[in-house]
Amino acid sequence: MRQLVSFQLDAEEYGVDVLSVREIIRLPAITKTPNAPDYVDGIINLRGTVVPIISLRKRFGLLEKEHDRHSRILVMEVGGRLTGFIVDAVTEVIRLSSGSIQPPPSLVSSGSAQDCLTGVINHGEQLLIVVEPGRLLGDMEHGVYDEAA
């Protein structure tokens, strides 16, 4: 049995393995960092740890929108370091049988932003896209942490 934390970006549902998520927090004040890549919103202080904050909307090439009371940061460990990812809303924890995740169609899973998409699930009336946290930054990871340091 596998569990995913599901979240929304725009009208789409995404999911990440629950074991990847350290915590889910409301958006605190985010400190902007100079010369950071456009997908990096800045950094936060999370109980004494400086955590870079990535906008998944920007990372996935979606239009920006104002954060609201539903916006959250998924704090995940990526490459041994804590990283926060801003999402529109966190919706639920889903329990899955191991065979329920199907590979994404090749047209959907090609391209730099889509490299992190690892599967698709039929979840009720809609499809849920499974994301691999370790691939969310890809080749950009070193620049993110250099900027946050």
Regions found by a protein language model. Give the residues of each.
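An acidic, low-aromatic, low-complexity terminal/linker signal
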Residues: 1-149
